[in-house]
Amino acid sequence: MNKIGLTLLLVWLAVRAIAADYSYERNVLYRGNAGDEYTSKMCRLDIAYQPDVQNAPVVVWFHGGGLTGGSREIPSGLLTDGMVVVGVEYRLSPHVETMEIVDDAAAAVAWVFDNIGKYGGDTSSIYIAGHSAGGYLVDMVGLDKKQLARYGKDA
């Protein structure tokens, strides 16, 4: 049992050491023309990056919550050496319809394509991922090309 505890401690310390090398840009508006207060409040993202790393792969992370709850996060497990991680917040039901939430996800991914280079991210190596409702948004944006086409992206 003692070995398990020691192993967990070492893993935790390693993750903390890697995470300590990261800088964060928080509360970034990804809808330039937000329009209303709710959209401006919700359509935000956080970026974790390593300032001295260039051409890093990028993970765009969508939180779960059944499209009715949850908030943006950057999972510590994704903070591996040389990766940029973007945690996305989006509007929630019942304030907006489901397809508006999908559009928020597409707008966030388009913003990443346009801006992630400033944070050392490689636009040819962007991956989208999510948990639960976030996984649904990943599917909707990733499998339906017209979602990103609205933002001039062919991905």
Functional labels for PLM-detected ranges:
Residues 55-64:
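Short beta-strand element of the alpha/beta-hydrolase
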Residues 65, 89-96:
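Short beta-to-alpha linker loops that shape the active-site pocket of alpha/beta-hydrolase fold enzymes
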Residues 110-155:
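Primarily recognizes the serine-hydrolase "nucleophile elbow" in alpha/beta-hydrolase
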Residues 57, 83, 125:
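Alpha/beta-hydrolase fold active-site loops
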Residues 9-19:
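Hydrophobic h-region of N-terminal signal peptides that target proteins for export
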Residues 71-88:
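Short amphipathic alpha-helix adjacent to the substrate-entry channel of hydrolases
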Residues 19-53:
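N-terminal cap/lid segment of alpha/beta-hydrolase-fold proteins
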Residues 2-10:
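Sec-dependent signal peptide recognition
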